[in-house]
């Protein structure tokens, strides 16, 4: 058995597709009416559809998990993030951990936590 995809719930699937394309270069693999699979295995699920499956509330900014990306030129990434999405909500501005890795954490458009760090 292997992990196939990671699914995140989004309010506006088209805005989210653009967000992940703009920042991370993810392209559309499959559009299945409220469910989009992007390259790298990320799945965007329309919130209304997801709620109908689970019959549970969606809790944005729950901070219980994160999407983790690595970027060699993190300063360039931060510049792109600030230019394309100037109102993005940061959890941690660009910082350096005690082990030397530089990271930034922020929420996507729907409160899903994202971390971008330099390669370890």
Predicted feature locations:
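Conserved short beta-strand elements that form part of the metal-binding/catalytic scaffold
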Residues: 27-61, 113-118
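N-terminal beta-strand motif that seeds the catalytic metal site of vicinal oxygen chelate
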Residues: 1-15, 65-67
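Amphipathic alpha-helical segments
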Residues: 14-26
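Short beta-strand-to-loop elements that line the ligand-binding cleft
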Residues: 8, 29, 93-96
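Vicinal oxygen chelate
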Residues: 13, 67-113
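Short beta->alpha transition motifs characteristic of CBS
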Residues: 8, 46, 98, 105, ...
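Short glycine-enriched loop/turn motifs at secondary-structure junctions
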Residues: 1-2, 59-64, 97-98
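Short secondary-structure junctions
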Residues: 25-30, 87-91
């Amino acid at each position: 058995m292997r992990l196939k995809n990671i699914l995140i719930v989004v309010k506006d699937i088209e805005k989210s597709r653009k967000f992940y394309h703009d920042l991370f270069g993810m392209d559309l693999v499959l559009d299945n009416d409220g469910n989009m699979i992007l390259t790298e295995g990320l799945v965007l699920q329309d919130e209304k559809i997801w709620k109908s499956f689970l019959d549970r509330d969606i809790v944005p900014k729950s901070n219980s998990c994160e999407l983790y990306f690595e970027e060699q030129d993190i300063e360039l990434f931060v510049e792109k993030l600030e230019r394309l999405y100037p109102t993005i909500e940061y959890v941690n501005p660009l910082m350096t951990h005690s082990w030397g890795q530089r990271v930034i954490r922020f929420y996507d458009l729907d409160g899903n936590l994202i971390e971008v760090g330099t390669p370890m």
